[in-house]
Amino acid sequence: MPSRLRKTRKLRGHVSHGHGRIGKHRKHPGGRGNAGGMHHHRINFDKYHPGYFGKVGMRHYHLKRNQSFCPTVNLDKLWTLVSEQTRVNAAKNKTGVAPIIDVVRSGYYKVLGKGKLPKQPVIVKAKFFSRRAEEKIKGVGGACVLVA
């Protein structure tokens, strides 16, 4: 017959909670967690977790993990890296000095060529430029400056 209560609710008020008398349902008989993986739990670790212990291969000292780190930004997002005021001033005075956008200061290394640039010259500083990006920047009368 199904019961309305879970077993734990039924056992409320019974001191041992179904685990016998003194010290029968003991604390951590095999140790806590992964204890004894190389000793009393060896069979389990060998069977179900082969290769858990030990080392393989050689260590690479002074390994540079982020050699290929190169965050990119597209041309259509280029003007979002400078303030609104700079953008407005550059649009107003067409013959004046071209604004400088340093993408490295904004955390990007490479400029990619997706999107269109407004028809006003701009000087872009970056570590890398894609071919299309360089063509488009020079197409609006701007310049690409490589920085280390």
Swiss-Prot record:
Recount the PTM note: Hydroxylated on His-39 by MINA.
Gene that produces this protein: Rpl27a
Q: What residue spans carry the region label Disordered?
A: 1-37
Q: Which HAMAP family match?
A: Ribosomal_uL15 (MF_01341)
Question: Which molecular-function annotations from GO does this UniProt entry contain?
Answer: structural constituent of ribosome
Its keywords, alphabetically, are: Acetylation, Cytoplasm, Hydroxylation, Phosphoprotein, Ribonucleoprotein, Ribosomal protein
Q: What does this protein do?
A: Component of the large ribosomal subunit. The ribosome is a large ribonucleoprotein complex responsible for the synthesis of proteins in the cell.
- Gene Ontology cellular-component terms listed: cytoplasm; cytosol; cytosolic large ribosomal subunit; cytosolic ribosome; endoplasmic reticulum; postsynapse; presynapse; ribosome
Q: Which residues carry this modification: Phosphoserine?
A: 68
Protein name stated in the entry: Large ribosomal subunit protein uL15
Homology family:
Belongs to the universal ribosomal protein uL15 family.
Q: Which residues carry this modification: N6-acetyllysine?
A: 47, 55, 110
The subcellular localization recorded is: Cytoplasm
